[in-house]
């Protein structure tokens, strides 16, 4: 499982390989070549790694190999299947207008390669944000507002693929 978000990081997760004593993580910006080892995990029970060396708007390719020590010699198992991750740019709200019947009309920019957007709102900038909409739309009408209350909004783009990637 590989997940990505708009905070310029990719989190990789994998299933434990029997008798593995660690894992090597490889990344490339090409699907078939140019892979470089970006991390060595020294524990066979560690099954996640967060790559903070990515940039939004770029596509990366990852593969993982289990590592072993057999009779004092280091060895590596076969590579996992190469997985593609598109790190999406962050969505940005460009318009919030007051509509009829005390509603707010919120619009945001589309993000290339996004399959949808999650809009969340709160009544305090650093408060708990509640998801208001998850869809492919780039606008939302927020109704049932309380007069005199200030509302805060955040939007993030995501991409769902068959391999579970979400940005």
Task: Please provide the spans of the model-predicted regions.
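Pro/Thr/Ser/Gly-rich low-complexity, intrinsically disordered linker/stalk tracts
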Residues: 1-19, 56, 72-113, 147, ...
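Extracellular low-complexity, O-glycosylation-prone stalks/linkers
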Residues: 19-37, 63, 113-131, 154
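Solvent-exposed loop/turn and edge beta-strand elements of beta-rich ligand-binding domains
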Residues: 32, 37-39, 54, 84, ...
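Short S/T/G- and acidic-enriched coil/turn segments that sit immediately N-terminal to beta-strands
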Residues: 45-49, 136-141
């Amino acid at each position: 499982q590989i997940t990505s978000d708009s905070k310029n990081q990719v989190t990789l997760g994998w299933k434990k390989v029997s008798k593995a004593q660690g894992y090597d993580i490889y990344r490339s910006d090409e699907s078939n070549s140019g892979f470089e080892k970006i991390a060595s995990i020294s524990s066979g029970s560690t099954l996640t790694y967060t790559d903070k060396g990515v940039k939004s708007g770029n596509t990366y390719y990852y593969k993982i190999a289990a590592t072993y020590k057999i009779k004092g010699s280091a060895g590596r198992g076969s590579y996992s299947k190469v997985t593609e991750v598109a790190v999406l740019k962050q969505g940005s709200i460009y318009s919030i207008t007051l509509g009829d019947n005390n509603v707010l009309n919120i619009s945001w920019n589309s993000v290339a390669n996004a399959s949808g957007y999650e809009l969340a709102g709160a009544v305090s900038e650093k408060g708990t944000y509640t998801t208001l909409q998850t869809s492919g739309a780039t606008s939302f009408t927020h109704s049932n507002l309380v007069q005199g209350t200030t509302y805060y909004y955040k939007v993030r783009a995501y991409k769902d693929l068959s391999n579970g990637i979400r940005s």
